[in-house]
Regions:
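Bacterial N-terminal signal peptides that target proteins for export
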Residues: 2-14
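Bacterial Sec signal peptide processing site at the extreme N-terminus
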Residues: 20-47
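Acidic/histidine-rich, surface-exposed loop or edge segments in extracytoplasmic proteins
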Residues: 43-60, 114-124
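Post-signal-peptide N-terminal segment of Sec-exported extracytoplasmic proteins
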Residues: 47-79
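Generic structural signal for well-ordered, non-transmembrane alpha-helical segments
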Residues: 67, 74, 143, 237, ...
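Acidic/His-rich structured neighborhood in mature extracellular/periplasmic domains
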Residues: 71-237
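Pan-zinc metallopeptidase signature
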Residues: 244-273
Length: 273
């Protein structure tokens, strides 16, 4: 008997989850449990793009977005030689704005993020939750320890080829060029991923996405699409420059602050711009 789509998705997921559990402490069991459950729901709730397009109940807007995504995926495989697997051949509709919420934390008066280590992915500067409430609860625990914490929504992520990542409602309505950028980026992670080296992994994926979008726009874009993407890229570049500027200023401020022996709080208050 041919295994069902559910069992095909379930068995490798459970194998990965079991391996993770064996390598983790008891305090991590609930975290891995929510991760396995969230990934399983994402896979089992997906349907092939062709089914959605053929379904008379699918809106005209969604049908158009799925057709665009299918064309982008075809370009990624045929022209960019990115992995030709089940990724982005299915679509999942979620009743929430993000697929994940990442928790990022730094110790008090530090810009060096706390790291968490996982099987396969290695050590990363974030911890993801499929539930916003669970992410916020974990963030509260970190703040109670004196950490600076941020909880941010994530529209997409890559399972690095372990599973067939679906298109998701959290990003399907991105403008065409930004949707292409997203898919090229996530597929690039399936090509090269060094566990524990987020800077290299993101730099590689960014290089692939930028080259891919340029080629895709040349083939399928129009002046309006090109102008919109150029403005998006410029805003992204300006925002990154702003972050780096204030990161440098904040780093200098932190280094100039001397904690008191009694409370640990700085003797001199921060001087914010």
């Amino acid at each position: 008997m041919k295994p069902s789509r559910f069992s095909q998705a379930f068995r490798p997921l459970m194998a990965a989850a079991c391996a993770a559990l064996m390598l983790s402490s008891c305090s991590s069991l609930s975290y891995y449990s929510q991760a396995a459950q969230g990934q399983l729901e994402l896979l089992t709730d997906s349907r092939p793009i062709d089914d959605w397009i053929a379904d008379p109940h699918t809106s005209v807007k969604l049908r158009h977005r799925l057709e665009t995504a299918r064309q982008i995926r075809r370009y990624a495989i045929q022209e960019m030689k990115l992995p030709d697997n089940g990724s982005y051949s299915n679509y999942t509709h979620l009743k929430r704005p993000y697929v994940l919420w990442n928790v990022v934390a730094t110790p008090e008066l530090s810009l060096k993020p706390v790291q968490w280590c996982f099987p396969v992915a290695g050590c990363v500067n974030y911890r993801g939750y499929y539930s916003k409430a669970e992410a916020q609860a974990f963030a509260r625990d970190l703040r109670a320890k004196g950490h600076d914490v941020e909880v941010g929504g994530v529209p997409a992520y890559s399972t690095l080829g372990w599973f067939s990542d679906p298109l998701i409602s959290t990003f399907i309505n991105y403008p065409d060029a930004q949707l292409a950028r997203m898919l090229f980026h996530e597929l690039a992670h399936q090509v090269t991923y060094v566990p524990g080296d987020s800077q290299f992994n993101e730099s590689f994926a960014n290089a692939v996405e930028e080259a891919g979008v340029e080629g895709w726009l040349e083939r399928f874009g129009n002046p309006m699409m090109r102008d919109a993407y150029d403005r998006y890229a410029a805003r992204k570049k300006d925002f990154l420059a702003l972050l780096l500027k204030y990161r440098g200023e904040l780093d200098r401020t932190y280094k100039s602050m001397v904690p008191t022996a009694r409370s640990g709080w700085p003797r001199r208050a921060c001087s914010w711009p």
